[in-house]
Regions:
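Acidic/histidine-rich, metal-coordinating catalytic segments
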Residues: 148
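Catalytic alpha-helical scaffold of carbohydrate-active enzymes acting on polysaccharides/glycoconjugates
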Residues: 1-44, 48-91, 96-97, 123-145, ...
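Glycine-rich, positively charged active-site loop/lid region within alpha/beta enzyme cores that binds
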Residues: 91-115
């Protein structure tokens, strides 16, 4: 209760299949699992691999797909377009600067420094997250994070999340909410021109 659920597919696969049917089958199976466990389909789709245009057309016109977090980084949400037509699905960028996987996972390539793996200093990661939040406040926009239980769930790394949440909630000017609420707001306003 209180947590937002979006899905990546069944197995965090880099590809959802070679055909429209294979791709939609994986998405449908994933949604069936959510319906069985949490009683409803996931409102968001966080694509780990590419979808063919025909699968995107079905997915982003599905009333259950409120938002996606795929595509290039941007400060404001946009409506997804497929074949030149705007869909109701809102794309909310999940920027790499605030993705725990990008910031904290063991990195063998590129080896930085050469010959050694890298795990970022926790204080640096927290500072990066805060700086992105401050910049978003200064210039405006939406900042969507990504936290993976297998990354941020360790005892030491969980402190980063605790401290970041304390920092965010200490600022009354931040609307701290779910991607589902951001997408609903964006849909009601009709996009950037009306916000």
């Amino acid at each position: 209760n209180g947590h937002e659920i979006a899905h990546h597919g069944l197995y965090h696969e880099p590809s959802y299949g070679d055909t429209v049917e294979e791709q939609l089958e994986i998405i449908d199976k994933s949604q069936e699992i959510f319906k069985r466990i949490i009683g409803k389909p996931a409102a968001g789709f966080r694509c780990t691999g590419g979808l063919c245009e025909e699968a995107e057309e079905v997915l982003y016109n599905d009333p259950n797909t409120l938002y996606t977090c795929q595509g290039e980084s941007s400060e404001l949400p946009v409506f997804m377009e497929v074949k030149g037509k705007k869909t109701h699905t809102v794309r909310i960028s999940c920027r790499q600067e605030v993705d725990d996987y990008i910031q904290m996972v063991y990195n063998a390539y590129p080896p930085i420094p050469a010959g050694l793996p890298r795990i970022s200093a926790y204080e640096d990661v927290l500072s990066n997250f805060k700086d992105e939040g401050d910049g978003t406040l200064r210039f405006g926009g939406v900042l969507s994070t990504a936290f993976h239980p297998q990354v941020s769930g360790s005892p030491g790394k969980s402190k980063i999340l605790d401290q970041l949440l304390a920092y965010i909630t200490s600022k009354p000017e931040i609307w701290c909410t779910s991607c589902e609420e951001v997408a609903s707001y964006w849909q009601k306003k009709g996009g950037a021109a009306n916000v």
